[in-house]
UniProtKB/Swiss-Prot annotation:
<dbReference type="InterPro" id="IPR045196">
    <property type="entry name" value="IF2/IF5"/>
</dbReference>
<dbReference type="InterPro" id="IPR016189">
    <property type="entry name" value="Transl_init_fac_IF2/IF5_N"/>
</dbReference>
<dbReference type="InterPro" id="IPR004458">
    <property type="entry name" value="TIF2_bsu_arc"/>
</dbReference>
<dbReference type="GO" id="GO:0003743">
    <property type="term" value="F:translation initiation factor activity"/>
</dbReference>
<protein>
    <recommendedName>
        <fullName>Translation initiation factor 2 subunit beta</fullName>
    </recommendedName>
</protein>
<comment type="similarity">
    <text>Belongs to the eIF-2-beta/eIF-5 family.</text>
</comment>
<comment type="subunit">
    <text>Heterotrimer composed of an alpha, a beta and a gamma chain.</text>
</comment>
<comment type="function">
    <text>eIF-2 functions in the early steps of protein synthesis by forming a ternary complex with GTP and initiator tRNA.</text>
</comment>
<keyword id="KW-0396">Initiation factor</keyword>
<dbReference type="InterPro" id="IPR002735">
    <property type="entry name" value="Transl_init_fac_IF2/IF5_dom"/>
</dbReference>
<dbReference type="Pfam" id="PF01873">
    <property type="entry name" value="eIF-5_eIF-2B"/>
</dbReference>
<keyword id="KW-0648">Protein biosynthesis</keyword>
<dbReference type="InterPro" id="IPR016190">
    <property type="entry name" value="Transl_init_fac_IF2/IF5_Zn-bd"/>
</dbReference>
Length: 135
C-alpha cells in the first residue's frame, strides 16, 4: 500500500501546474461600432490575445459565421455590413466552444497544433487531443 501511495505521489508531481489551478475563465467581450455599412470591432486583437489565438484565425471564423467580408487593420477588425455587438459576441462564444475550451476537462488552456494536414486542439491541462474542423 505504501508503494502505491509513493507511485501516486510521483505521478501527481509530474502533472502540469495548470491542472491544480481553479481560476474562472471569462469570454472577452467585443466592442463594436457601426459606421455607414461597416462594423468596426475596436478591441479585436485584445480579444484574440485573451483567447490565446491568432487574430487571423478568429477573424476567419467570424467572417464565415457572419457570411461577410472583412480584414484586420491595426488592433481592430473591419466587417462589411451592419452587425450588432450582441451578434458578434454570440459568434465569439461559438468560437470559444469549438476552438478554445477543451472537450474533456472544459478548461481554456489549449493550443491549436497541426499534425500532417489535420488541426488538433491540444489541452495543456489534461493532455487531451481532439481533431478540429478546418476553417
Amino acid at each position: 500500500m505504501e508503494e502505491y501511495e509513493n507511485l501516486l505521489n510521483r505521478a501527481i508531481d509530474q502533472l502540469p501546474p495548470e491542472v491544480f489551478e481553479h481560476k474562472r475563465f471569462k469570454i472577452p467581450k467585443a466592442y463594436s461600432d457601426i459606421q455607414g455599412n461597416r462594423t468596426f470591432i475596436k478591441n479585436f486583437k485584445d480579444v484574440a490575445e485573451d483567447l490565446n489565438r491568432d487574430p487571423q484565425h478568429v477573424l476567419k471564423f467570424l467572417l464565415r459565421e457572419l457570411g461577410t467580408a472583412g480584414n484586420l487593420e491595426g488592433s481592430r477588425a473591419i466587417l462589411q455590413g451592419k452587425f450588432t455587438h450582441y451578434l458578434i459576441n454570440e459568434r465569439l462564444e461559438d468560437y470559444v466552444e469549438k476552438y478554445v475550451i477543451c472537450h474533456e476537462c472544459n478548461r481554456p488552456d489549449t493550443k491549436i497544433i497541426r499534425e500532417d494536414r489535420i488541426f488538433i486542439l491540444k489541452c495543456a491541462a489534461c493532455g487531451a487531443k481532439a481533431p478540429l474542423k478546418p476553417l
